A protein has these predicted regions:
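Active-site loop-to-helix "anion-binding N-cap" substructures in soluble metabolic enzymes
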Residues: 1-383
């Protein structure tokens, strides 16, 4: 899908060279504490590589959606504290890259770029102001490569630009799923948004040997074919052509766990599809579906998974997602899992070990797999 990207190992790094690293620091922070550090850990090998070669690192990133205005709760300051501890060296924090004088510090973390409207507007003047802090640019933020933003696109055209280690890993792993993967290939989709996942379902019905759908995504497909889903979450979106619902490769749950409320401790029951009551929510896939999906996965050589099988943020309804993870982990196959909700559940249950690749991308992963050009990747290719 994509030509080989020019990466760090292709870069001539001189001692004292200032390198702007666009990182992915979009993580949940509560009361100043980082909830999940996995995205931060993903950039550490790139930072360590540069430090070993005496480069001066300038970290740029975003957090949340402040809408072009400053928000104390979306400051990157806590990220700086984590990086300093993880790397064992000082990380200077700058609250304003545009007022920052040139510095000889080994590492500087600039404030949340989305505090300025120029970032999301892909403003070239904004990018030029950032470029003054660097002699070269590295993109280590695959998760936002589908965004046409200044630090992702324009900045890559103003400096010699390279792909970070994790970004290259993402592109290689997802390309491996798309280009001549070992067969049988099984794709598993869950979650909510049908407008982003329906193109993938259709694509993999053509390319894969089996497509398994669960979660709220399956609820929507049940509703589209006329099955009752009670009060369940659906996302009807734009679905003019429903012929894919009859594809023999498409596998939906045959039984589900239902509950009166999607909260811990709520009374629940198992229902066959077609027997869900009007006052019930579909909360998870049922035990027969878990067994059936495990059988479909047996013998697979390539597996792609994005999206939980139910309301997995509630532990009572995470069993289907956990069962899916356990089935995939034991395969002798190339396995890729992605999507923030899915990865979060697997991490909480210590189930990430055994997957060939855990993607940090959400929307970027889906767009890549749909065959769309990602602006951030294209900007690197133009180099």
């Amino acid at each position: 899908m994509y030509m080989i990207l020019t990466g760090l190992r292709d870069m001539a790094i001189a001692s004292g060279m200032r390198v702007l690293v666009r990182a992915d620091f979009d993580v949940a922070i509560h009361a100043g504490e980082i909830v999940d550090v996995s995205r931060l850990e993903a950039v550490l090998p790139t930072i360590a590589f540069l430090l070993e070669r005496k480069a001066k690192i300038r970290l740029i990133a975003h957090l949340g959606r402040p809408g072009g205005t400053r928000s104390e709760e979306l400051s990157l300051a806590p990220i700086g504290h984590f990086l300093s501890r993880a790397l064992g060296c000082p990380v200077r924090f700058s609250g304003d890259p545009f007022q920052e004088a040139q510095s000889d510090a080994d590492m500087i973390l600039f404030e949340n770029l989305r505090f300025w409207p120029g970032e999301e507007q892909n403003d070239r003047a904004f990018a030029k102001a950032l470029a003054l802090h660097g002699d070269a640019y590295i993109n280590e933020a695959f998760a936002v490569c589908h965004r046409n933003h200044a630090s992702i696109v324009s900045l890559a055209g103003l400096l010699p630009a390279y792909a970070g280690f994790n970004l290259i890993r993402e592109v290689e792993a997802l390309s491996r799923v798309m280009e001549h993967p070992p067969r049988p290939v099984v794709a598993v989709f869950g979650g909510v948004k049908i407008e982003t996942k329906l193109p993938l379902i259709r694509r993999f019905l053509g390319d894969a040997d089996r497509v398994i759908v669960g979660g709220a995504l399956a609820n929507t497909l049940f509703a589209l074919r006329g099955d009752g889903v009670g009060k369940s979450i659906t996302d009807m979106g734009s679905t003019d052509d429903l012929s894919f619902l009859n594809d023999a490769k498409l596998s939906l749950p045959t039984d589900v766990i239902v509950a009166s409320r999607l909260v811990a401790g709520a009374p629940s029951a198992t229902r066959a599809i077609g027997e869900v009551q009007e006052d019930e929510y579909i909360a998870d896939i049922g035990p027969k579906s878990q067994e059936r999906f495990a059988e479909f996965l047996n013998g697979a050589k390539t597996v792609l998974w994005n999206g939980p099988m139910g309301c997995a943020e509630v532990p009572d309804f995470a069993r289907g997602t956990i069962s899916m993870a356990e089935s995939i982990r034991k395969l002798n196959a190339f396995t890729v899992v992605g999507g923030g909700d899915t990865v979060a559940v697997l991490r909480q249950n210590n189930l990430l070990m055994g997957f060939s690749h855990v993607s940090t991308g959400g929307g970027a992963m889906l767009e890549f797999l749909s065959g769309k050009e990602l602006p951030g990747i294209e900007a690197l290719r133009r180099q």
